[in-house]
């Protein structure tokens, strides 16, 4: 009984040991062990000529490109460029690197890439680029059994982006990344987007502080140079600028400063210190805003949209200051002098009228006329020449330049009566004509100038804003 139980327990314990021995024997014969892989890599690199492309003398090598965009770090209007960090992958087939016996892909150390042929790819519009090197150089080389090579890099590049800033900051920009072969022509190498529309990834995850990526487009083409035709791939980003920052930093302050300059129209015109200080402060503030904006933009020859708005605000602020200069000139300057002179002329005329109303009579009862009265009477007699009698002469000459008025005849009385009846008719016509005239503000009245400015400036500025935003906002 004991013997049978010992045999059964011994059989149960020996079964796992036998399975382990079989597995060890199988693993010792596995061709993917370290020694076999080492021999395979040594065999692939032995006699490999890095100077010759795959299928040298045969058809061109097809190189597929894939880009995973990690971030767009900066878009600079001053330097006309943008900075892009990406995972850049290239794949091609090299029959010299095909192997068998190992059903696995071989991911090798990045230093092996220096011993293999790789495409001479470069970025056409590159200004400054580098491959990240922390903690080691960020390169990947992976071999497939059929000889396909996958070569990956983590690159940060600063690429040129020519911008049209005529509609800045209500603009859209198109920034591209141009990928091209430097030395190999289309007879030796061809580029294509590996994966079609899915060759570029990560764009939808990018968030920029001043831009929104509206769309991106991939293009494959050939370019002709004197040395031949070269393959080129283009990745273009359509960037739309976010207006929120500029509304808060530029448009709203400029608008409020312009409105603030109109406060002077409600300040009394004799408060020179207050109105001048307010006008100069608003002008200097607008100048500061414009100067700060120009420092953040390149020196370009054309006018930008924001320049037009700031210039319009500056003109309104400056005109508000000039309006007080005009009011001050009317109130304290030449205007009062003209008013004083007109008052003196009016008093002189009234004095002359009083003197003319004084009647002088000689000893014979004749009325004495002065030289001014003679002229007035003469002009009146010329008008009534047609109805007067040549025999009824109203004046007689005296060497003392004093004239004697004789009694009027019936015809003279008729003429004077006609003249008296004609004057009221002319007065009625003049009154009716004055009623038809449009009321025009008196520019010599300082209160009227300020009153009209309170309406003119806001209405004109509102029309300016309506035209501006309708034109520049799509």
From Swiss-Prot:
Transmembrane segments: 246-267, 271-293, 305-327, 452-473
Signal peptide: 1-25
Protein origin, superkingdom: Eukaryota
Family stated for the protein in its record: Belongs to the ligand-gated ion channel (TC 1.A.9) family. Gamma-aminobutyric acid receptor (TC 1.A.9.5) subfamily. GABRB1 sub-subfamily.
GO biological process assignments: cellular response to histamine; central nervous system neuron development; chloride transmembrane transport; chloride transport; gamma-aminobutyric acid signaling pathway; monoatomic ion transport; ovulation cycle; response to progesterone
Intrachain disulfide bonds: 161-175
Gene that encodes the chain: Gabrb1
GO MF assignments: G protein-coupled neurotransmitter receptor activity involved in regulation of presynaptic membrane potential; GABA receptor binding; GABA-A receptor activity; GABA-gated chloride ion channel activity; ligand-gated monoatomic ion channel activity; ligand-gated monoatomic ion channel activity involved in regulation of presynaptic membrane potential; monoatomic anion channel activity; transmitter-gated monoatomic ion channel activity involved in regulation of postsynaptic membrane potential
Residues given in the record as histamine binding sites: 122, 181-182, 227
Localization per record: Postsynaptic cell membrane; Cell membrane
Domain notes: GABAARs subunits share a common topological structure: a peptide sequence made up of a long extracellular N-terminal, four transmembrane domains, intracellular or cytoplasmic domain located between the third and the fourth transmembrane domains.
Listed PROSITE patterns: NEUROTR_ION_CHANNEL
Protein name: Gamma-aminobutyric acid receptor subunit beta-1
